[in-house]
Amino acid sequence: GSGLVGSEMCIRDRWSVTTTVTSNGSVNGMHDSTMPLSGMVEMLNMQINTWFGGVGVGWLNYYTFIIMAVFISGLMVGRTPEFLGKKVEAREMKIATFVALLHPFVILVFTAISSYVYTHHPDFVESEGGWLNNLGFHGLSEQLYEYTSSAANNGSGFEGLGDNTYFWNWTCGIVLILSRFIPIVGQVAIAGLLAQKKFIPESAGTLKTDTVTFAVMTFAVIFIVAALSFFPVHALSTIAEHLSL
């Protein structure tokens, strides 16, 4: 079937997951040729942008979600939100929320802009080579993947998109800057705020962060805040394409 086009038959699927779940970007098969749901998994790895951390920044995004999970869990069970012996308060939570929501915001806004330009300014698009070699649901997937890869500092792409143009080079550069440097500033600010606070010894009222329950809570926060933010656009692209096969 079409999923075998441009494929390395041995470890292509495993490598497509490995390269997108980290800031790797190398490929041994064409991601654009994978089946729609496989493409969705590849994109979600970068859109969640948490599991294994990124080159040069490590698990900063994961720690952002831990801060959010600690704060929410503390409010739910009536215990003091603490992490590593430091109180997690409103200032840290606000910064963590901003950082967590910036990633989907940047990706979705720029995908909307590119879709608008493609639809309403066809002359400009034609002057840059036409951009899309695939229309419809898959065309939207190609645009979404391009900005997702840029935001996650990945570098892979759905290569049916003609992206070596002024528009794509400039907009992807802007996305990369916004999605990489602003979160780092926010995460370092959280570290600075926590470093200024006094160490609080663990007590009966301390929310334990080394339990299975807290791990499940952290996963739920990641799923709700990160993954579900992209459900509407996937419903219009990868999921819709899958259902149309």
Label every PLM stretch briefly:
Residues 108, 112-160, 164, 171-177, ...:
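Extended, low-charge hydrophobic alpha-helical regions
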Residues 65-74, 100-115, 188-192, 217-229:
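Hydrophobic core segments of alpha-helical transmembrane domains in multi-pass membrane transport
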